[in-house]
Amino acid sequence: MQTFKKSFLLFSPLFLLLFGCATIQKIGFSQREKLLSAHLKEWENIQIDGIIELNYRGFSFRKNVVLKKMGDRGRIDIFDSGVFGLKPNPFISAYYDSTLFVRLPEQTKFVEINNSSLERELPDLSFIKIFDELVSNKKKILIEKEYRNKDFIFYFSDEMKLEKIELTQENFYVLFDYLKELSKISIFKNSKEIANIQIDKISYKNIKIKSL
């Protein structure tokens, strides 16, 4: 009898774990719909502050970065020093509306990236215009946990958070990692990580993008 009691006490945590896993309820459709709507809403206007590490074609650095998205417009500024330093001038900047403009360290003005070798090296940023399309296709996302068109595939987690964007015509994809909220963005080309952003702060209000 004592042996039975000892065996029961030894295995009871395992029984509880298995029973608990068996009785966990999946998130219902209506709850997932609320989660998806809230998550897509966050991506309408967003500012991300963090540290970017880039290592691509001999171009390597680790610097402060600020990403902003407002509707169909986006901007990224990479700073040579801290954002709140004495001279917080961007080291590299990129602006996207319907066309991509970039200002590199040796340039004083933004240059339109159009039919150039640099354009072929950069991912297609028009995916920032697709979020309205995602909203209008929520039912499809809820069922399949993804949305695709001829250019992109958006993958979503069980919690209805965006976890991957794949560029179907190119060898680029972007991964999104979460703790309580978005904590890291990783960019891959040809299955090799070329950049990642460790996120320090996310804002959803009072976002301003300086036009060119």
What is the predicted role of each segment?
Residues 20-72, 208-212:
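N-terminal leader/targeting segments and the immediate start of mature chains
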